[in-house]
Structure formats: structure tokens, C-alpha cells
Amino acid sequence: LIAQLTYPEWDYRRKDYHAQQCRVMFQEAEEGGDLWIPDLQARRLFRKVQRQFEALRPKREVLRGQLDGVELDIDALVRAQCDFLANGSSSDHIYIKSHQQARDLAVAILVDVSLSTDSWVSNRRILDIEKEALITLASGLATCRDTFSIYTFTSRKKHHVRVTAIKHFNETFNSQVLRRIAALRPGYYTRMGAALRHTCQLLSKRPERHRLLLLLSDGKPN
């Protein structure tokens, strides 16, 4: 158990919050589970998504007409020479500088593992669809080298909302994380508000300029 924290909860009847209404049990994921081996269709999907994310990967930005740099900007140099011959003065901004663009993004993925995800759609269990979607998304974010974390949530009652860390922000996306995803099991109820507030709190501590929370759920309250 990492921590126990309390959060308010919205009452739609009163149109107000109940202070300190829910208790979140924040814990580490179990290390069990076999390494998930994707089938041919899933591998094709992974490759497709990775190609799409590769297009978003930060590239080197070339800045021309700079005061200093490791390479001369020929166009700027010619203009400067022409200006000097014409009026006796010219600009010193005759260099090219390049630097790596930064996306500066942190993403928190929150996954619903309540009992309703044990239902079946088109001959597939919802939780298995969630796992495949989660791995696909995480692979894409890893391709972009974005900082991201993965958490799951379920609840027994308002004093026991379980949020589990599958991957922390400072962890790499590796086979150990894949095993944790493979070990996910459905159970209990969908108390979403406290889990969202806890994930928002974790995300708010990140130094990145842009922060994104993604909720992966079947949308069915249990």
C-alpha cells in the first residue's frame, strides 16, 4: 500500500460536494501474469499506431539567421555581404542553429477494471479489449518518448476505492509492465470520481507544461 487518501464526492441530487467522502487506497500492482503475446491482427494494429505516433515524434528544428551556430547560413551570408557593399553595414546573424523540439507532455492513463468489464462484446471480453487498447496506446506514447503513467481503479464502497499503479511516470514501458497489464482482473464497482481526482493530483505534480488524463472505460456503471 502506497498511501490512503480522502477526497470529496459530487452529489448530483444536492448539486454539491460531500467533503472527505471517499477514501482511496493507492497501491502497487501485482507482479504476476504471463507476458501477453499479441496475435497477428493486434501486431498489425500496433505497427499502424506506432507509425502514426512516429510522425508526432519531436524532430530537430533548424533556425536560420542566428547570431551564432555551428554552420553558416549561406543565404544570410550573401544578404549580409550585399548589404555591406551597398551601405557599409551588415547583420551578424549569419549562422544556422538546430535544436531538438520538445513536446513537454505528461500523460496519465486511468483504466476501469470494475466487474462490468467482465462482460462480452462481439465474442470478446471487454477487459481484454481494454488491455489491447492500453498496450497499443502505451506503445505509441513510448514511441514518441512521452512521459506517461498507467493506473487502474475499482471500488468496494466509498471507503475503499482502489487505485493501482501499473506504471509510474519514472518507469520504462517494458516486459514487467506488460505482465502487470496481463494480470489485470475485473471486480467490484465503478466509483470513478475519487479515482479521477487522485489521478489528477498525481498528474498535477508533473513538471511538464502539458498534462493529459485519459480515461479508458466501458462507460457502464457497476
Give each language-model segment a name.
Residues 117-148, 199:
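…and closely analogous acidic/polar surface helices at protein-protein or active-site interfaces
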Residues 111-113, 134, 199, 208-222:
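DG-centered beta-turn motif at the end of beta-strands
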Residues 30-35, 113-124, 178-185:
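Glycine- and acidic
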Residues 1-78, 88-106, 121-122:
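Negatively charged
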Residues 159-162, 166-210:
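Von Willebrand factor
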Residues 77-97, 134, 195-201:
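Flexible, glycine/threonine-enriched loop-and-boundary segments that flank and lead into catalytic domains
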Residues 146-163:
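Substrate-binding beta-hairpin/strand module that engages nucleic acids
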Residues 98-126, 217-218:
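MIDAS-like acidic motif and immediate structural context at the N-terminus
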